[in-house]
Amino acid sequence: MKEFELNEYSFQEVENLNINTPNNNNNFGVVGDDFQLNSPDIQNSENQFKYIANELETDSKQYLSNLDAENNHNENDEDFKLRKYFENSQRVALGNGQKPKKMGVSVRNLTVVGVGADQSVISDLSTPIFKILNLFKPSTWKEKGSTFDILHDITLFNRDGGMLLVLGRPGSGCSTLLRLISNQRGSYVEVKGDITYGGIPAKEWKRYQGESIYTPEEDTHHPTLTVRQTLDFALKCKTIHNRLPDEKKRTYRKRIFDLLLGMFGIVHQADTIVGNEFIRGLSGGERKRLTITEAMVSSASITCYDCSTRGLDAASALDYAKSIRIMSDTLDKTTIASFYQASDSIYNLFDNVAVIEKGRLIYFGPGNKAKQYFIDLGFDCEPRKSTPDFLTGVTNPQERIIRQGFEGRVPETFADFEAAWRNSSMYRDMLEEQKEYERKIEIEQPAVDFIQEVKAEKSKTTSKRSIYTTSFLTQVKALIVRNFQIIWGDKLSLGSRYLSVFTQSFVYGSIFYNLETNINGLFTRGGTLFSVILFNALLCECEMPLTFGQRGILQKQHSYAMYRPSALHIAQIVTDIPLTIIQVFLFSIVVYFMFGLQYDAGKFFIFCFTLVGATLATTNLFRMFGNFSPSLYISQNVMNIFIISMITYTGYTIPKPKMHPWFSWFYWCNPFSYAFKALMANEFGDLSFDCQDTAIPSDPNKIIVYDNSYRICASPGASMGNLTVSGSKYIEESFHFRSDDLTQNVFILYLWWILYIVLNMFAMEYFDWTGGGYSHKVYKKGKAPKMNDVEEEKKQNQIVANATSKMKDTLKMRGGIFTWQNINYTVPVKGGKRLLLDNVEGWIKPGQMTALMGSSGAGKTTLLDVLAKRKTMGEVQGKCFLNGKPLEIDFERITGYVEQMDVHNPGLTVREALRFSAKLRQEPSVLLEEKFDYVEHVLEMMEMKHLGDALIGTLETGVGISVEERKRLTIGVELVAKPHILFLDEPTSGLDAQSSYNIVKFIRKLADAGMPLVCTIHQPSSVLFEHFDRILLLAKGGKTVYFGDIGEGSKTLTSYFERYGVRPCTESENPAEYILEATGAGVHGKSDVNWSETWKQSPELQEIERELAALEAQGPSSTEDHGKPREFATPIWYQTIEVYKRLNIIWWRDPFYTYGSFIQASMAGLIMGFTFWSLKGSSSDMSQRVFFIFETLILGILLIFVVLPQFIMQQEYFKRDFASKFYSWFPFAISIVAVEIPIVIISGTFFFFCSFWTAGLYTKFNEINFYFWFILILYLLFCVSFGQAVSAISFNLFLAHTLIPLLIVFLFLFCGVMVIPSSIPTFWRGWVYHLNPCRYFMEGIVTNVLKHTDVKCTSEDFTHFTNPEAVNGVTCKQYFPISEPLTGYVEAINEGDESKCGYCLYNNGEEYYNTLGWSFDNRWRNLAILICFWIFNILMVITFVYITRKPRR
């Protein structure tokens, strides 16, 4: 038997294959126009046959070989039919007794109830207050907002193997219908009605998750993975069990991988990273194809595609639809799709069409009958208008055309259309057809075969009731590989992390270098071990944003039934282990031996093993809070409270005996405490510490010699007459644990890690914070419109009509002639450079609209980036002129650029975003009222008047405006600026036909008013294409195919191609699709003509070059003197005010962030205050005061992590605004610093009042109390500004989290507490200690608190020793007189008994801080220095914002 080998292959362009309608024996499911398709090369047919056989669960390799032999006579036949190929493969499956999973869908009386717009308003800082007050108002307890029907009484069906096209304007409920059909029911108030899948009810269908999938409009992928890695992972998770006999999984995956990449034309991008809006990778169209390919890998029986052609050019979209058609026909795959701007070529591929308006079904039936249905209602279709555009346009009064004689008789509102449909004969026929289909289902019972096939696909170790194809172990393995690939794909962050750790290890090692083995090194050695735990804990902070960043991808892939969410966490654990081991080893190999810890291999590895456990536990603790929290800020603040508690109750700053009962339980629930005990036991267990020179009593001047028999070490664990202290005795008496418990403590530490793993798995399985892809809008209070209301619809239609009628009166543009010549753009790639634009030239004039077209990846967006001066990477060559002059500093300001990615600040409303653009970008001479009036006009024209007071929000949280509405807002933001030149990158992508028509008509008016503009457009209908005057057509590689006039009826354009042998363009054909087909655009398009070379030799190019030279020489026809060109429209002071006002609004509307800071400070204050409850005047209490202040230091450091995500997010929005010259870098930098000041002051005040009195720090000296509060506020301001400065220079949040610990080391290690100043190595003490702001904070606040503190030791605080001279009448003070440099005092333990003496280390607090070289007199100097450091941080923020002001693109 012949063995097949896998070779690479690709599909040819889809054409010339007759597609027949599936024989359903009814009048539904009729395909309109036939189309044809060329096959792949016959030499690769063996591989493709095997793929199909696998997809159909064929296990007959012999039969497949025979079938291949039968087809060998076609080897040189280029017309080998792909359809025939699929049909033959289907026969292979049937011949082996297997059947495809044939599952149709039947929907009856489906009603979906959503949250009304008035049910929730935009949250702000007043919202929680009013909610609390409402608890005391019984009248509000039963108040509920309104609901509305997103879908109302929908009844339709789609047979197995059928293709249903769902049409409707944005907001009509198309996406909701697709979600419900794919059985995604979360986030809706109520779902009524029935949906059955081949007779299986929706409730039972949950067991077959992954057999009906929803592919969302947005593209969500890991940006650092390549295409190959993304799809290979999906294939590993969806590899079926019933493959061909003896076929390896790897071979199976590779065959499908090659097939799908060939089908969608991304073979050459296989090793390109996916990228996103911030990371360069695939183009938008290529990323969309990857999304479709990933969905196909799932091999679902029912697939719902939501606007999946967004970003694809017309030819690629058609190729994609044809592939879907063939798979539906031959493999009985059921497809439901919702497309915006579908061409007739795509429309005709579908069996049935459903038209939805405002949640009402207004037509369902055969696609070839829909147009006539609406014509019979009284509507007329314009020539060359596509059928989908006509079907969605009839509901819009501004677009529809009423046939003569039907005036006043046609439906006007969505309710009228629904009533007309329900009264039609087609509706009754549809109901009968649905009943007949359901009877057929009852007879044939396709669910039986379906269930058997689903079970057969599952691996042997997968439960037959599981929704997953592969086993849990297989999922984990695939996820482990993917996790490593993700990490390796971001080498910068990985390298930065390890470099940071390695660098910090030397800092740690040098400051604690060669620790003393005498009694002076006892406490320092413990502090060293405590600090290494703290350092590794802070490194784990980066896990929090990573947890939130992967939620969208997890939700999508889980809906595809690729893997269990808990499997992802197990894979993360496996990934963590080697990375953590490397991190800990790099740190430990340096610090362990530089510290001078015990040179014992066993102890070194226990040290490493314990640190690994502590790091793993902390990492999973951070993830746990992320998985249990809906918001990053909530989890960040809660986690910071826990970190402070964990540090406090580690057992070092406050030993176990000093803990109060109300919080002491946390000591036992704290993994840090077990790690600390393990490290201490490991190091101290068999060490002894000498105190020969420091034993009590002693004479520093060496005059008095004491008998060693009566001397004792001044340390816990000491015994009379023994001048050494046992390490094990020391830790037992100081910290109340035994060194023998080392193994137990390590074991418990790892048990905490396991517990956090279990809790994470539980949270990931049962908590979904993404909203399931469903989003809802929130409005300002009282501004919510009525949803799906007839009167509201009429009102909105009238607004649009009025706006259209007064457009000419409003638009007054001032444009110029913009030319570009010989534009070349190259980017560095591995092994050299890549040319993306090749000698592109052209112009745009006032009054002209130029279309920029080409297949996906041809360089359209790249050209616009170059022309709009947005490129900051690569090399640009060529010349650009405006009115014959080189471009000046104001070019970006006077041009508008509608970018492909919709980047908006989520904390603003739609109206606020537009007004902000108008205020800062229109000329300052324009009155504010006029600017706002123009904003309202644009809102009306963009059909967004009802959205004016809606929060923009984010798609990830499910709160905010939709994808389509964001696109309209992107356009509106540029239009309100009244630019002189307008660049638009796919302005109609993702919009429905009517919205696209309105936008194109609007920019046509702009052009007619004198604005020159160029617009990339992927899928223009004939009607849209007619609005353009000229076209620049690009081929792959950025080569020019044509630049010139389109001509009336596109005759000038089409005649150019006809002149070189292309077939004539018919009257009914879309010219845009015609030229793309002619030039070989699309997934597998090709052309026999080298059009770029043809253009170079054409007379049209020579004429273009002559005119370009004339235009550059001519210059402007008239000039206006507007003074010196200005980079920004408004002065800096005005920009600063407006930016500050905007940030204030955003902060005001983010209670999670703002109140989170307040709560974090308050809770930290209460925890610390009650932990160090009512400190007295004992020696140990004085030490507790110092540690209380030290933990205040840590609070400020943790605040740094809170500001990171907010600053980095706002900086991304700033970069987008700066590129369009909204405002300069200085207003942003100074405003984002200023907006944090009141939050810091309030937070610090809360902390002060919650901790100062509870800890017993209050004194009768008001100046001291005030000073504590003042320097605390300054320190917190320093920390926040420090975090902002680091954020400003970081490329992403992960890098910022990596840099922060490196810098924090210098702050808390050199503050004078962890290591006293005299013990800091000379190298560091000479500069770092004096440049450390925390040193001045600690000196100022410690001297302030301890200045008036008198120390009175308790019996436990005294170092007890015997006075042998007591019998001779010598008192304790006489026996041991205190002389410098010793501090403290001596007294009898029991009054009247001078034989038992006690030594107290300090007399007062001043003696303590004098040993550190600190002075109370320096407190105001320290405060002034801290102010200087804060100002320095602000200058660094400003500097770094300036350096990074331009995005990398």
From Swiss-Prot:
Biological processes per GO annotation: aggregation involved in sorocarp development; sorocarp morphogenesis
List of residues binding ATP: G854, S855, S856, G857, A858, G859, K860, T861
PROSITE patterns: ABC_TRANSPORTER_2
A Gene Ontology term for the protein's cellular component: membrane
Protein name, per record: ABC transporter G family member 19
Protein's UniProt keywords contain Cell inner membrane: no
Keyword Lipid biosynthesis (UniProt): no
Main location group: membrane
Cellular localization per UniProt: Membrane
Family: Belongs to the ABC transporter superfamily. ABCG family. PDR (TC 3.A.1.205) subfamily.
SMART domains linked to this entry: AAA (SM00382)
Top-rank lineage group of the source organism: Eukaryota
